[in-house]
Amino acid sequence: MSQTIPQITTGPLPGSRKIHVPGSLHDIRVPMREIAVSNEPPLVVYDSSGPYTDAAVQADIARGLPDLRGDWQLRRGDVAPYPGRQVTAADNGFAEGARLTPAFPLRRDPLRAAAGRAVTQLAYARAGIVTPEMEFAAIRENEGRLVAHARDGAPMGAELPDLVTPEFVRAEIAAGRAIIPANINHRELEPMIIGRNFKVKINANIGNSAVTSSMEEEVEKMVWAIRWGADTVMDLSTGRNIHNIRDWIIRNAPVPIGTVPLYQALEKVGGVAEDLSWEVFRDTLVEQAEQGVDYFTIHAGVRLHMIPLTARRVTGIVSRGGSIMAKWCLHHHRESFLYERFDEICEIMQAYDVSFSLGDGLRPGSIADANDEAQCAELRTLGELTKIAWARDCQVMIEGPGHVPMHKIKANMEEQLRHCHEAPFYTLGPLTTDIAPGYDHITSAIGAAMIGWFGTAMLCYVTPKEHLGLPDRDDVKTGVITYKLAAHAADLAKGHPGAQRRDDALSRARFEFRWQDQFNLGLDPDTAQAMHDETLPKEAHKLAHFCSMCGPKFCSMRISHDIRAEAEKQAGMARMAEKFREGGALYLPVAESVAEAAD
C-alpha cells in the first residue's frame, strides 16, 4: 500500500501560520491563514488549504482527514446509516489486476436522510435553523475581522454586509441566493458558501483521462490546487479507476468536490452515448452520493427542440455533457432522461444534500456563438428546473459560459439573474477572445473578473492547457493563481468589505522596500521571490531600496522617499519660521518698548 501513496505537498506558505477562530453558536474552530507583516499587525486571510498547511498536523492520506461533521449530523438526528451499494467492476471502468487502483483503506457505512426528513442546508435555512455549517461559513467570510472596514466599489446589485453573520448566511440560503455544498457523507468537509453577496469563489478542475494521469497525480493536484486557493474542486475523470480515485480524493478533501456523473455513466456503457439509460445514470448518482460528492453537474437543460439551434454555430456544442445528451436525444427522438426524470434526481439530491450545478450544455464555444438563441433557450429551462429543485429543498447553482466578448458579458449576468431567480451563477471564464491557445487562462481571466464584478458567485478556472491537453501540476497552479487574481479584482470592484486590506498592506511594504513582506503578502510568494532573486539573489538585496528593473538611481519609490523627506524638511522649516514670526509679535525690540512706555 505504501507504494501507492502519493507524496503530497504540505507545510505553511512563506511567512504564514494556521490559526483557528472559535464559533459562538456551535463548538467549531474555523481555520484561517495569518500572514506575518513587519512593523504591522499580522494580516488574516481566507484559507481553503485544509490541514495540509498546518505545521502542527502530520498528514496521512491513507487515513484521510478527520471526521469534522459527523457529530453535527448525528446530533441533528435526521440521518440514518445503511450498508450502501456494492462497488462493481463497471464503477472502475472494468480495470483489474495491476491496472486497478487500490480502494481507499477506510470504509464507513454511508448516511442518507431518515424517512420523511429533509437534510439539506436549504431545508434547515427555511426552517429558521442556523446549522454549524452556516456559522462556519459566516466566520470564514469575515477573515478574522471584528469591525467594519472602509470600502470602495460599485456592488452592481449585490448586498454586502459589513460583517457576515450566521443569520445572514441562513437568510441567503433560504432565499436561494447562496448554497453550502455539503453532502452528508463528506464528513471531512470544511463548509464554505457560494453566493454573490459573499466573496467570489473559484473552482479548479482535475481528473484523469483514458490516456493519462493516475490516482497519485490527482490527489496531489487536489492538495496543490487548494494550497493556492481553490475553493472547490471538480473531479472530471473519464478513464478507468474513476470510483477508487474519487474515493481517495474525497476522503482527503477539505473543500467541496463536484463531478459530472454523466461521464462515469458513459464509461459504464462502453462510451456509447446512445446506450445510456436512466437506470445506469441513477445508479451512478447514488454511487457518487454515497461517496460524498458535494455537487453534481446535471445537463438537464438540453432539450430536443433546442439542438437544431446549434446547427449554424461556428463551434456547435462544445460541452462534453451537452454533446452526449444531444446525441442521445437525437438517436432516441425524445427528451433526455435527465429532463424527464428530474423529479427523481431531486429525490436523490435531497436525500444526501448534494447540490445541483445545472449544466450549460449549450454554452458558446466561440465568441461568434455568444448569447445566441440556443444558449438563451437553455438558460430559461434551467430557471424552470431551479424552481422544481427548490420546491424539493435542493440547493441549486447555475453554470454559465463559455466564450463571450467583453461587451456581451453584462447581458449574460442580467439574463441569468432574471431567468434563474438569483440562484448563484458559476461560470467558466468567460473567454473574451479565441486567438490565444496556450494563454486562455489570461483570455478567460479578463472575462472572469468582469462577470465576477457583475454578480457571478463562483468562477471555474481555465489553465494554459485549455483546448490543448490535460493540465499537469504546474498548469493547475497557474490556473488557480490567475483565477484568485480575477476573483479578488471582482471583490474589489464590488466593494467587498475588507477586500482592500491585503492590497494596502502590500502597497505599504512595496513603498517601504520590505521585500519579504511583499513576497509573503502576494498570491504566489514562491514565484515572486524567485523572480526577484534571479537578478538580486543575495540576502543583502532583501534590504535594498531598489530592484533590478530601475536600479538605485532610477527607482521611483526611492526618489519618492527623497521627495517626501525634502517636503517634510521644508514643512518643518516653514513651521519654525512661523513660530519665529509669532515670537517677533510677542516680544518687541527694546527701543520700541521704551518708546511705547513713554507715550
UniProtKB/Swiss-Prot annotation:
Keywords: 4Fe-4S, Iron, Iron-sulfur, Lyase, Metal-binding, S-adenosyl-L-methionine, Thiamine biosynthesis, Zinc. One of its GO terms (biological process) is thiamine diphosphate biosynthetic process. Pathway: Cofactor biosynthesis; thiamine diphosphate biosynthesis. Substrate binds at N205, M234, Y263, H299, S319, R320, G321, D360, G361, L362, R363, E399, Y426. It holds the Pfam family ThiC-associated. Zn(2+) binds at H403, H467. One of its GO terms (molecular function) is 4 iron, 4 sulfur cluster binding. GO terms for cellular component: cytosol. Its cofactor is [4Fe-4S] cluster. It catalyses: 5-amino-1-(5-phospho-beta-D-ribosyl)imidazole + S-adenosyl-L-methionine = 4-amino-2-methyl-5-(phosphooxymethyl)pyrimidine + CO + 5'-deoxyadenosine + formate + L-methionine + 3 H(+). Binds 1 [4Fe-4S] cluster per subunit. The cluster is coordinated with 3 cysteines and an exchangeable S-adenosyl-L-methionine. Disulfide bonds: none annotated. [4Fe-4S] cluster binds at C547, C550, C555. InterPro entries: ThiC (IPR037509), ThiC-associated_dom (IPR025747), ThiC/Bza_core_dom (IPR038521), ThiC/BzaA/B (IPR002817). HAMAP family: ThiC. Homodimer. Catalyzes the synthesis of the hydroxymethylpyrimidine phosphate (HMP-P) moiety of thiamine from aminoimidazole ribotide (AIR) in a radical S-adenosyl-L-methionine (SAM)-dependent reaction. PANTHER family: PHOSPHOMETHYLPYRIMIDINE SYNTHASE, CHLOROPLASTIC, THIAMINE BIOSYNTHESIS PROTEIN THIC. This is Phosphomethylpyrimidine synthase. It comes from Paracoccus denitrificans (strain Pd 1222). The lineage of its organism: Bacteria, Pseudomonadati, Pseudomonadota, Alphaproteobacteria, Rhodobacterales. The gene is thiC.
